[in-house]
UniProtKB/Swiss-Prot annotation:
This is Cecropin-B. It comes from Hyalophora cecropia. It holds the Pfam family Cecropin. The keyword Phosphoprotein does not apply. Belongs to the cecropin family. InterPro entries: Cecropin.
Length: 62
């Protein structure tokens, strides 16, 4: 019976420590900056698409 109590206590302790260490760390900010940069590039390409299409049509005309 003592073994089961000790086992339960150790299991609860490990579970508590694993949930605390799962908190996000500051190093994730680097990936967020990379993601934001990629988003800005994608949005710039989407916005420039119609202008590039107009230039292509103008070049084809003459």
């Amino acid at each position: 019976m003592n073994f089961s109590r000790i086992f339960f206590f150790v299991f609860a302790l490990v579970l508590a420590l694993s949930t605390v260490s799962a908190a996000p760390e500051p190093k994730w900010k680097v990936f967020k900056k990379i993601e934001k940069m990629g988003r800005n590039i994608r949005n710039g390409i989407v916005k420039a698409g119609p202008a590039i299409a107009v230039l292509g049509e103008a070049k084809a005309l003459g």
